[in-house]
Amino acid sequence: MIEADRIISASPKREEEVIDRAIRPKLLADYVGQPSVREQMEIFIKAAKLRDEALDHLLIFGPPGLGKTTLANIVANEMGVNIRTTSGPVLEKAGDLAAMLTNLEPYDVLFIDEIHRLSPAIEEVLYPAMEDYQLDIMIGEGPAARSIKLDLPPFTLVGATTRAGSLTSPLRDRFGIVQRLEFYSVDDLTSIVKRSADCLNLNLSPDGAYEVARRSRGTPRIANRLLRRVRDYADVRNNGVITSDIAKQALAMLDVDSEGFDFMDIKLLQAIVERFDGGPVGLDNLAAAIGEERDTIEDVLEPYLIQQGFLQRTPRGRIATSRTYAHLGIAKLD
């Protein structure tokens, strides 16, 4: 199964973009969670405005779905400037980047998502732009080619990535501010779900919000997606009223359990416990047992299970923890 097809996938879905923009917080005052990031950014933005300067270049990293794009837009809104948005894979030629840079107004924000996927040629153009607000471009071809420098207005580059370790050192070192986004607590996600429900004019009880939040794997994007599907269920089965019981019924219908696991997570855990006596089991054997690719298990299924303490990676293989046995309702043999 493709990761993006799972309802608990943190990957963005194109059809969700319009609604996501409508419920996305616009200012730091509306931004829930990430208290350290919020406090730091409030100070940095106020200081830049007091000095009438562009905000330092900002790198935001962390798992998908935690609000990197949201934070980039908040920075632009708080600074009172425009934001231009692109992504690493889209910037194929130096001219593409040059066109964006030369159209910036003073203090504008240039947001590059998936910045770890920039080509080396694009990075070379970025270095002087970030450091000196200058653009080095080549005019002409062959022996007649010459380099000219163009002055750029002061601007803020905001880069977002799920793989900070994949950035080259020269690029990473040019960011004056680096922020890591962490998974959200259930309390913070409950607040996010309530806010989204208000934006969408939903009839949502506090207990209903909690049931959605606790299954959202620490990720606002998943929380908002589950809320929309629960809304569909409530519209058909309960006149649009989302109670705790309605939320539980809707999420059970979607095969999302109390831990936010779907059938793929459960299939993996059951295989380790029931077919391999809890492990250790090698990755190849596990992949064959559940009919999934090695990469899918390693990159998609395992990270959240490990982070929540349901699975251990060891040199000898994967091992199910006591939490797995308790969750599956299976007695652990000594």
UniProtKB/Swiss-Prot annotation:
Residues 185-255 are annotated as: Small ATPAse domain (RuvB-S). Residues 258-334 are annotated as: Head domain (RuvB-H). GO terms for biological process: DNA recombination; DNA repair. ATP binds at residues 23-24, 65, 68-70, 131-133, 174, 184, 221. It is an enzyme of class 3 (hydrolase). Pfam families: AAA_lid_4, RuvB_C, RuvB_N. DNA binds at residues 294, 313, 318. Keywords: ATP-binding, Cytoplasm, DNA damage, DNA recombination, DNA repair, DNA-binding, Hydrolase, Nucleotide-binding. One of its GO terms (cellular component) is cytoplasm. Residues 4-184 are annotated as: Large ATPase domain (RuvB-L). GO terms for molecular function: ATP binding; ATP hydrolysis activity; four-way junction DNA binding; four-way junction helicase activity. Mg(2+) binds at residue 69. Its main location: cytoplasm. It catalyses: ATP + H2O = ADP + phosphate + H(+). Its EC number is 3.6.4.-. SUPFAM superfamilies: P-loop containing nucleoside triphosphate hydrolases (SSF52540), Winged helix' DNA-binding domain (SSF46785). SMART domains: AAA. It comes from the Bacteria. It is found in: Cytoplasm. Belongs to the RuvB family. The RuvA-RuvB-RuvC complex processes Holliday junction (HJ) DNA during genetic recombination and DNA repair, while the RuvA-RuvB complex plays an important role in the rescue of blocked DNA replication forks via replication fork reversal (RFR). RuvA specifically binds to HJ cruciform DNA, conferring on it an open structure. The RuvB hexamer acts as an ATP-dependent pump, pulling dsDNA into and through the RuvAB complex. RuvB forms 2 homohexamers on either side of HJ DNA bound by 1 or 2 RuvA tetramers; 4 subunits per hexamer contact DNA at a time. Has 3 domains, the large (RuvB-L) and small ATPase (RuvB-S) domains and the C-terminal head (RuvB-H) domain. The head domain binds DNA, while the ATPase domains jointly bind ATP, ADP or are empty depending on the state of the subunit in the translocation cycle. During a single DNA translocation step the structure of each domain remains the same, but their relative positions change. Homohexamer. Forms an RuvA(8)-RuvB(12)-Holliday junction (HJ) complex. HJ DNA is sandwiched between 2 RuvA tetramers; dsDNA enters through RuvA and exits via RuvB. An RuvB hexamer assembles on each DNA strand where it exits the tetramer. Each RuvB hexamer is contacted by two RuvA subunits (via domain III) on 2 adjacent RuvB subunits; this complex drives branch migration. In the full resolvosome a probable DNA-RuvA(4)-RuvB(12)-RuvC(2) complex forms which resolves the HJ. This is Holliday junction branch migration complex subunit RuvB.
